[in-house]
Amino acid sequence: MTITGIIAEFNPFHNGHKYLLDQAEGLKIVAMSGNFMQRGEPAIVDKWTRAQMALENGADLVVELPFLVSVQAADFFGQGAVDILDRLGIDSLVFGTEEVRDYQKIADLYTEKGTEMEKFVENLPDSLSYPQKTQAMWKEFAGLDFSGNTPNHVLALAYAKAVAGRNIKLHPIQRQGAGYHSVNKDVDFASATALRQHQKDQDFLERFMPSVALFEQASKVIWEDYFPLLRYQILSNPDLTTIYQVNQEMAVRIKEAIKTAQSVEELVELVTTKRYTKARVRRLLTYILMQARENVLPEAIHVLGFTEKGRQHLKSLKGQVSLVSRIGKEPWDAMTQKADQIYQLGKPSIAEQNFGRVPIRIETN
């Protein structure tokens, strides 16, 4: 049987995600971000709600990406997620993309010339941002051009790099309907961005979300809910360079900007430069919010939920892969668990995220 991996945020889960799961074959394993997203923002609803949405709509097994995999630039996010899925035995990786290319060929190219390609990136001027350097590399070696508004295509290339040299086939699916950042309501498939923006529009949600009741019952948060706490973390820390990935230049800019910024968005605007993209700045602010430090990734994989089919697969992995299904006195990953505690501060109604929580079981698919 085919074992298909899907890397996702489901922020929130919508019909486009359901379409992706429907297109996937065999046993479907999702490696999903926890409570903080790749672009450096809190998830609109918590990881358990999003895992349940996925399991109700075609996923067989949902595992959690640790915080230091979830909140990373595309390459590191892709690498960390593929590492986890590879250990769970996938032989195919399905993903949505704005531009269906021969990603397998691109992965083979990276297998062959990876060292040379990375050297090329290292020699590019530091005035370029990391995404610009990566795009220059793909243009040079694979003749790829970028239109600028194709975040899924950029992630797909990160997945191609991550599967290079592994026995995993890439299976791109053409993204349906609205673009990633689109807030357009008049489409067949709405984007997660549009759903977050129109979260109070009942008819809109019902049109584009398969598990709308779960979404409506869940506590919802936005970055601004954490702004007072972020502000406190910045003001009370005498040396921001002790935080993961924060350099001297960024520390100075953030300290200066917090004097006048009245919101997270304003702070991001003030700190962003040509070299430091908004997404990168948001990630740095997320690290500051968590007081994140460089940390070893957990050996074990945290299981958020499964169907009967997923449970059977986990049983077959026993003894080969270290799995965590309940977090007790011993932490699974201290950094992720700290992030979850801070996530809970966003709204008093958010349920406990770890202790006593057991995987969600969905009996029928």
Swiss-Prot record:
Principal localisation: cytoplasm
Lineage of the species this protein comes from: Bacteria, Bacillati, Bacillota, Bacilli, Lactobacillales
SUPFAM superfamilies: Nucleotidylyl transferase
Gene name of the encoded protein: tmcAL
Recorded family membership: Belongs to the TmcAL family.
Official protein name in the record: tRNA(Met) cytidine acetate ligase
Superkingdom of the organism of origin: Bacteria
Enzymatic reactions: cytidine(34) in elongator tRNA(Met) + acetate + ATP = N(4)-acetylcytidine(34) in elongator tRNA(Met) + AMP + diphosphate
Alphabetical list of NCBIfam families matching this protein: PRK13670.1 (NF010191)
Localization per Swiss-Prot or TrEMBL: Cytoplasm
RNA-binding recorded as keyword: yes
